[in-house]
């Protein structure tokens, strides 16, 4: 089988879609040496992403950094590469695909946030998504997604038959492990002035409910006076004025720290040393940090919204993400009731066994095998 994969998010500093692409693509190549793989990049790439002798890698012009260049890359460069290589199937793990390619296509859709919450996206990118994403959903021969919530959402929102959509849950990457108490103390000394801390990781953006989280933390500090900090790891995204305002108005500003991008070697340690992960996002397709927290034996406070209850199971304290009071009460519950927090950890040890990159990769491979067609030679 000749499998072409869109690997443009395999960048030097892996984030989000890059990690997803890495975890799936490396397993496909390693577990199926009998198959040939074509990795399609949109710029120069690192050799570590060529996972084996059965992988051919191409950098296609242009670097797809803008909606007009996305169109050029997917509708001109990609179809030509697929045709010349004789691909039997094209897999796109980032919710984009080529409408002009004559090859059977499978894509992963992680969520429909661009359709449901377009106000959080720059204007031109928003228009691109609103026009093309519905077309992509109907063009794909099969759609993979990362939760049953998103599967149902695609069917309802885009009118795609459920038989064309299947779920392959994300897994947790290697390195997320519990720490010994002395190691936790080292992390707290480095990042939190030696204090316990609540932790958030992800984009710093209003869609992630960061303004309410900051105000809820402020409430928690006022009510309890607890010697606890709030650490937020992640890049500042577009439209962060509301986040900045919430921070500037916080009475506990000295105990709130924006860490920016955290190296992949440090993120598991920050997660493992946290008092709890605070993940009260308004909209998610999976909520990977919750699974990472479960693997580090860290309690989770999560939003009772979208896919998060499905992924969290009984491993998280679920709260109303629109209520700052409810979030603050959740923080207080975890801070004051350590027996309850340990119960969340125990539940997380069981819940995390439901999610595996190995299982996800094999499901995706079976979908590709069923979808593959005669290589396009036209």
Which functions belong to the PLM regions below?
Residues 1-378:
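Carbohydrate transferase catalytic cores enriched for Leloir-type hexosyltransferases
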């Amino acid at each position: 089988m000749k499998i072409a994969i869109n690997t443009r998010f395999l960048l030097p500093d892996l984030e989000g879609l890059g990690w997803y692409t890495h975890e799936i693509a490396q397993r496909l190549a390693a577990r199926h040496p009998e198959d040939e793989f074509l990795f399609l990049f949109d710029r120069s790439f690192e050799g570590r992403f060529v996972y084996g002798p059965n992988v051919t890698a191409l950098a296609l012009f242009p670097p797809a950094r803008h909606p007009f260049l996305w169109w050029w890359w997917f509708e001109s460069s990609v179809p030509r590469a697929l045709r010349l290589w004789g691909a039997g199937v094209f897999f796109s793990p980032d919710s984009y695909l080529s409408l002009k390619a004559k090859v059977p296509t499978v894509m992963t859709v992680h969520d429909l946030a661009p359709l449901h919450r377009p106000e959080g996206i720059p204007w031109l990118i928003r228009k691109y998504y609103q026009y093309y994403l519905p077309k992509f959903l109907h063009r794909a021969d099969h759609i993979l997604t990362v939760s049953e919530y998103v599967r149902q959402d695609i069917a309802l929102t885009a009118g795609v038959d459920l038989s064309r959509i299947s779920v392959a849950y994300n897994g947790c990457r290697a390195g997320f492990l519990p720490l010994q108490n002395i190691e936790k103390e080292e992390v707290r000394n480095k990042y939190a002035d030696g204090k316990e801390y609540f932790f958030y990781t992800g984009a710093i953006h209003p869609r992630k409910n960061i303004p309410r989280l900051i105000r809820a933390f402020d409430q928690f500090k006022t009510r309890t006076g607890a010697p606890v900090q709030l650490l937020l790891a992640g890049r500042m995204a577009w439209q962060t004025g509301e986040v900045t305002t919430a921070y500037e108005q916080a009475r506990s500003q000295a105990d709130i720290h924006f860490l920016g991008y955290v190296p992949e070697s440090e993120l598991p340690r920050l997660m493992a040393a946290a008092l709890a992960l605070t993940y009260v996002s308004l909209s998610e397709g999976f909520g990977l940090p919750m699974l990472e927290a479960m693997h580090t034996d860290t309690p989770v406070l999560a939003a009772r919204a979208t896919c998060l209850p499905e992924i969290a199971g009984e491993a998280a304290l679920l709260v109303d993400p629109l209520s700052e009071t409810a979030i603050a009460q959740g923080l207080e519950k975890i801070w004051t009731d350590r027996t309850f927090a340990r119960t969340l950890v125990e539940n997380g040890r069981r819940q995390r066994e439901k999610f595996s990159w190995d299982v996800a990769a094999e499901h995706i491979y079976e979908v590709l095998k069923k979808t593959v067609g005669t290589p396009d030679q036209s």
